[in-house]
Amino acid sequence: MVQKKLMLLGGLRYLLPIIEEAHKLGIYVITADYLPDNIAHKYSDEYCNVSIIDKDAVLKAAQKLGIDGILSHAVDPGVVSAAYVAEKMGLPFQCSYEAACILQDKSRFRQFLRDNGFNCPNAKGYSNVEDALKDVDYFNWPVIVKPVDSAGSKGVTRVDYPKDLPNAIAYALSESHNGHFIIEDFLEKKGFSVGSESFVVDGKLLYNGFYDQYFDKNAVNPYTPSAEVWPSIMEQRYQDEIKSELQRLFTLLGVTTGLFNVECRVCTNGKAYLMEVSPRAGGNRLAEILNYAADVNINEAETRKSVGLSIENMHEPNYKGHFAILVLHSEKEGTFQGVEIESDFKKKHVIEEEIRVSKGGNVGSFTGANAALGTLFLRTENRDEMDSILACINKYVKIILA
């Protein structure tokens, strides 16, 4: 039997579990980006030097290498290229190239939601500042300004007054790949912002790992999650509504099989909104912790899907307690010395520790998910215990800077 080849776009730590799952299945792994020193390349079988946002260059490399599957797992910039290559080569992917382009462009996604009767904030996309400044009366202030093509809350600003719009647009454009940005009404949430790692099989939404997002109000970017907690305490009626709307979205887009990262919220107006839906795993190791927290290995399922292997026994997660990802970060710049974790807390609640920065490395403030220093996986018996820990996390976990 000829060994299957899987191309993974990117080289970050998020790919390591997929490389491990692929190797368990006897799959040959090729990692691809333009940064040969990235950590994932040390664990793959082959490295391909190519820009993952250049879809035609990725296609050319994939055809030359004779791949059987492609993923941009938890790597947002490569999703469109992965969908493009999969469609051109007849490989498995969550959706068509056109559907991926809609989902990956915040402006196009908002328009698609609006055209198809989904709850959607008042929103408009732009490619130049002047057009946006002419539309200040179109919006119900405050507004959110963000790039149409970035993830991890990079380039996102809440703007309360029109006079501050130019600076917010400049920041959004500084984090954009394609030079486009979107402005939309700020939706005041009720309870937590919620996300989900959701898995679809043959067009049917079968798995939803809903989690609640926590934010550090002292961070430079207060819209970047500082923790995620499972299972979500969103009211069941809203979870059911979100699942129903996701299924409707996936049917309209002709989705097939694979993993999606979803962000949603219930607002003070009583409506539930789909905020982001991307055909990839979420960052911050979301799919990884679900393998601790619940009874379905979605990383294995996504790996199997990528090369056309069957997926069995996909179902809603049954949780084994209450779990959290704590995103280690600094509120100021400095030189990294280490992370101090209180010993009893570590013994009782920390199930995995991951540090991405070496001692002596430069540390920046928490401007986005890419500024994370690492993660802690936490477990408690109940939600009240988890909430009390997160409310005073600095008592247990300290970032030491010089």
Name the predicted role of every residue range.
Residues 310-348:
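A glycine-rich beta-turn/hairpin centered on an aromatic-Pro dipeptide
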Residues 113, 139-159, 177-190, 196, ...:
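ATP-grasp fold ATP-binding core
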Residues 119-122, 142-145, 157-190, 220-228, ...:
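Conserved ATP-binding module of the ATP-grasp superfamily
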Residues 5-7, 143, 205:
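Conserved hydrophobic helix-helix packing surfaces used for dimerization/oligomerization
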Residues 260, 345-361:
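A structural supersecondary motif
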Residues 1-99, 130, 309-312, 321, ...:
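ATP-binding N-terminal substructure of ATP-dependent carboxylate-amine bond-forming enzymes
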Residues 163, 185-255, 259, 266, ...:
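ATP-dependent carboxylate/phosphate-activation module, predominantly the ATP-grasp catalytic core
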Residues 87-155:
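A conserved helix-loop-beta module that forms one wall/lid of the active-site cleft
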